């Protein structure tokens, strides 16, 4: 465990020009910026052209609020960024620190995004073959080509493969992987039974395999998570732990 922590501490992604994107995506900033311009224009026109004081005041308040929101989102983006505040990297570090993997065999990353977690796993465990799957919707600007370029830049392209996939129905046979990871994915899948998503992920895990799945384990999404953890133990999973990682990142 100490050796793995040492390896993790030595890994810094994105130092060769790789693009890992950001959880605070550009479309969000562009949308807020666009609304700011519109409300600012309305405030100006209402005041100087139409002389509608109430509308001008309301639009000005909206514009100031949007400006503050844009500044906050920009700060959050900086905190998340690789090479910035490093929040994304710290989260990935924490998730993999709980994966008791010997580094031999196949590892699956469900919802790989820009490939950062998959690539970090490949760097930590040089004998592992890593597969990353994602639906790659438009919200974050991630994609398969981005993942493959990042893996090549970090020198692990030969051991990483990325493919389009759906966490609801993984396109792999039962017991295909020795380790499974996922970070902050399931809560984003609308109208899905979150427990069913976890069970689909665990379906492809080999007997004796290990997993580390990080998500918002809110009762409205997962129900009683302690009860669910016990159900997994009753099904034969030898060690199931619920860990609050909020203080670790």
Regions from the language model: what does each represent?
Residues 86-104:
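Conserved alpha-helix/loop element of class I SAM-dependent methyltransferases that forms part
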Residues 168-180:
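A short acidic, Gly/Pro-enriched loop at the edge of an enzyme's catalytic core
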Residues 20-30, 70-91:
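Class I SAM-dependent methyltransferase Rossmann-like catalytic core
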Residues 125, 189-191, 205-207:
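Helix-to-beta-strand junctions that scaffold the AdoMet/dcAdoMet cofactor pocket
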Residues 114-126:
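Conserved SAM-binding loop of SAM-dependent methyltransferases across substrates and taxa
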Residues 208-215:
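Conserved beta-strand signature within the Rossmann-like core of class I S-adenosyl-L-methionine
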Residues 195-207:
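A short glycine-rich, Lys/Arg-flanked "PGG" loop and its adjoining helix->strand segment in the class I
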Residues 103-113, 131:
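Conserved class I S-adenosyl-L-methionine
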């Amino acid at each position: 465990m100490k050796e793995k922590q040492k390896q993790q501490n030595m890994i810094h992604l994105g130092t060769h020009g790789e693009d890992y994107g950001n959880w605070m995506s550009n479309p969000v900033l562009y949308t807020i910026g666009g609304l700011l311009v519109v409300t600012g224009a309305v405030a100006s026109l209402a005041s100087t052209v139409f002389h509608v004081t109430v509308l001008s005041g309301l639009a000005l308040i909206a514009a100031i609020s949007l400006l503050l929101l844009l500044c906050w989102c920009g700060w959050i983006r900086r905190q998340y960024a690789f090479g910035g505040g490093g929040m994304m990297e710290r989260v990935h570090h924490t998730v993999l620190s709980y994966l008791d993997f010997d580094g031999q065999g196949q590892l699956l990353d469900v919802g790989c995004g820009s490939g950062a977690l998959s690539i970090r796993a490949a760097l930590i465990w040089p004998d592992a073959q890593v597969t990353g799957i994602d639906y790659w919707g438009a919200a974050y600007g991630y994609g398969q080509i981005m993942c493959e370029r990042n893996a090549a830049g970090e020198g692990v392209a030969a051991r990483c493969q990325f493919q389009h996939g759906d966490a609801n129905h993984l396109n792999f046979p039962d017991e295909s992987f020795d380790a499974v990871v996922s970070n902050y994915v399931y809560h984003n899948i609308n109208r899905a039974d979150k427990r069913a998503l976890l069970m689909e992920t665990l379906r492809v895990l080999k007997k004796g395999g290990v997993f580390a799945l990080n998500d918002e384990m809110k009762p409205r999404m997962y129900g009683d998570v302690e009860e669910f953890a016990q159900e997994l133990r009753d099904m034969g999973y030898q060690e199931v732990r619920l860990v609050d990682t909020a203080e670790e990142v």
